[in-house]
Amino acid sequence: MLSVPKSYTNGKMDQVVFQKQRNRLNQCFFKFKNQTKYIQFRLSEEQYNKLKISGETYGLSPNLYAKKLAQKSHLKKPYLEHDQAKSLLLELSKQGSQFKSASFRKLLDEHQLLASYSKPGYPYDNAVTEVFFKYLKQREINRRTYHSIQEVQLSCFEYIEQFYNNYNPHSANNGLTPNQKEENYFKKNIAHLTETDIVDRLLKGSPALRVGYQLYQDFLYAVKERDYVSFEELLTNNIMLPEGYQTILRTFQKFLPQIKNALQQSYSNGPLECLNNHIKVLKRNAYGFRSFYNFKLRIMIRHGNALIFN
């Protein structure tokens, strides 16, 4: 099991231990891609991106998968998520005193985490994050006064979604904005797929979705063939499905007598329900009719039974 050295005493020992720490990422953010199923990276930048709201200090902390704002106590949240996901979490930080402290190293060891430390005076590991926060503060944060963390979250969300992703080009994207780059990627890699290929890819990546999709198709086939026996078997043989599916199955169980009648009898109220739905749509749209006669006439024309009386 990989971990940082276990030395929790303060003083000169800390400096000796951390001289041996190396930059595990070395700007290769996907170097562990083939070794672990889940990889998470956290960048510790609170010491440079603090914000005071109503006398309380908050840290602006980025995540490579989702840019969110959190309080300083947010450190423990990714650790708890890491414990549940059984994934490899790399804590990328600078060699500040708060990240060399015994308590911080002890926290890493308790959750079996790795630390990757940038070299002193070497800003390139966090260059992207530094630039992002620089312009975030210049263009948005420093121009406003906030009274709650919710206001900050909304402000940053609007900046990222409405401006940064749509109007901020990057040289790394050949002068394209993030949204344009993403759109080009999907056009190049996804557009050629058929609907069947897309469904197959989705089902291949999620076993639970695959089981649920197959159950859905089985129900459709049973209804199409009017096979009540198969329909009832599907309700009793899928007790191990996730809770989301169990809700639907319980609804089917509740109305099972009515479903049985619908599958076994030759008549159906489907046409009547269809007619009522069309009437509701016509009524909702109104079509500008102000008299009941014109409204009734429009309904009859829609269904091909119009009789015009003088």
From Swiss-Prot:
Coiled coil: none annotated. The keyword Protease applies. InterPro entries: Integrase_cat-core (IPR001584), RNaseH-like_sf (IPR012337), RNaseH_sf (IPR036397), Transposase_DDE (IPR002560), Transposase_IS3/IS150/IS904 (IPR050900). Keywords: Hydrolase, Plasmid, Protease. Its EC number is 3.4.21.-. The keyword Protease applies. This is ATP-dependent protease. It comes from Lactococcus lactis subsp. lactis.
